[in-house]
Amino acid sequence: MDEKIETRLIGATMQSNEPDLERSIRPKRLSDYIGQAAVREQMDIFIRAATNRREALDHVLIFGPPGLGKTTLAHIIAHEMQAGLKQTSGPVLEKAGDLAALLTNLEPHDVLFIDEIHRLNPAIEEVLYPALEDFQLDIIIGEGPSARSIKLDLPPFTLVGATTRAGLLTSPLRDRFGIVQRLEFYRIPDLIHIVKRAAHILNVVIDENGAGEIARRSRGTPRIANRLLRRVRDFAEVRANGMINESIAKEALDLLNVDIRGLDVMDRKLLETIIKKFQGGPVGIESLAAAISEERGTIEDVIEPYLIQEGFILRTPRGRIATELTYQHFKLPLPTQSTLQENFDLLGKVE
């Protein structure tokens, strides 16, 4: 992926310098896990019940957009179960032996966390099925005619799988999770709480309005909120007395080109192109990609999802259309109905 996409300030994927920072502010207990009230309440019940029965927790699948706390929740599950945690990711497990090495080193009730579980090799999945259902591992010893299969008993353990693409999981794998949790984008009050908690851990002085300004521009995502907090902290230390209030946060985020709705330069460029070059749309994806000099995949996978989710653009069979919200955001007059109809007719002829 393009380097500028990977280092996008409001990108939800983790950047190379962030793992240690995220670990330092990650909550360890379910009671400290902010937001996701339904998920938190359900997991509290499931964990208490399993603990009281002295059993391993059922296997857990956590899915949702990046940056919402899937890894954090996996760590909390292990901590609350007073169990060890082994962590890996789907792409890292290249052969059956890699998975076998992890499984045979688990202690009773341990948690095995597999991030990006939708990217597991199908051959690895086949090894995983009996381990999940029967806590047994089938291993092939030898090669050719002399090869034989032996079964190893595994201690009861909990698999926690995390994915941003639940639809890519195979049905047999998905069906083996007893607990499935979907993480939603966060509300502003929860993000304010998250920003204030991170500020306290990082020894940053911030008031309620300053936290609110950061939260509103964080696209409903804690990872982005914490990243913006660190950048605003830099600004406050250099340009002010180190304290973050509403005006300091606003000035810093404006300087960073993150507007009040969390849109950055790439978002605004795409929206303004639809409005100014294509009269609000509809515009085909290939034409749009050429107009803003971006790859089609970048638009579809990186830029568009948040804009569609927030209602800035509509994706129709005829192409992308800027909504009324987009015109309001840029303080531009709405196009007439006749202009929109002409655009539809023109695109239909081109296609």
Swiss-Prot record:
Name listed for the protein in its UniProt record: Holliday junction branch migration complex subunit RuvB
Top-level lineage group: Bacteria
Record: residues binding Mg(2+): 71
Keywords: ATP-binding, Cytoplasm, DNA damage, DNA recombination, DNA repair, DNA-binding, Hydrolase, Nucleotide-binding
Oligomer status and interactors: Homohexamer. Forms an RuvA(8)-RuvB(12)-Holliday junction (HJ) complex. HJ DNA is sandwiched between 2 RuvA tetramers; dsDNA enters through RuvA and exits via RuvB. An RuvB hexamer assembles on each DNA strand where it exits the tetramer. Each RuvB hexamer is contacted by two RuvA subunits (via domain III) on 2 adjacent RuvB subunits; this complex drives branch migration. In the full resolvosome a probable DNA-RuvA(4)-RuvB(12)-RuvC(2) complex forms which resolves the HJ.
Residues bound to DNA: 296, 315, 320
GO biological process, one term: DNA repair
CDD domains for the chain: AAA
Compartment(s) of residence: Cytoplasm
Reaction equations catalysed: ATP + H2O = ADP + phosphate + H(+)
Principal location class: cytoplasm
Region of interest called Small ATPAse domain (RuvB-S), as start-end residue ranges on this chain: 187-257
Enzyme nomenclature, EC number: 3.6.4.-
One Gene Ontology cellular component annotation held by this UniProt entry: cytoplasm
Biological function: The RuvA-RuvB-RuvC complex processes Holliday junction (HJ) DNA during genetic recombination and DNA repair, while the RuvA-RuvB complex plays an important role in the rescue of blocked DNA replication forks via replication fork reversal (RFR). RuvA specifically binds to HJ cruciform DNA, conferring on it an open structure. The RuvB hexamer acts as an ATP-dependent pump, pulling dsDNA into and through the RuvAB complex. RuvB forms 2 homohexamers on either side of HJ DNA bound by 1 or 2 RuvA tetramers; 4 subunits per hexamer contact DNA at a time.
Keyword DNA-binding: yes
Comment block on domains: Has 3 domains, the large (RuvB-L) and small ATPase (RuvB-S) domains and the C-terminal head (RuvB-H) domain. The head domain binds DNA, while the ATPase domains jointly bind ATP, ADP or are empty depending on the state of the subunit in the translocation cycle. During a single DNA translocation step the structure of each domain remains the same, but their relative positions change.
SUPFAM superfamilies attached to this UniProt entry: P-loop containing nucleoside triphosphate hydrolases (SSF52540), Winged helix' DNA-binding domain (SSF46785)
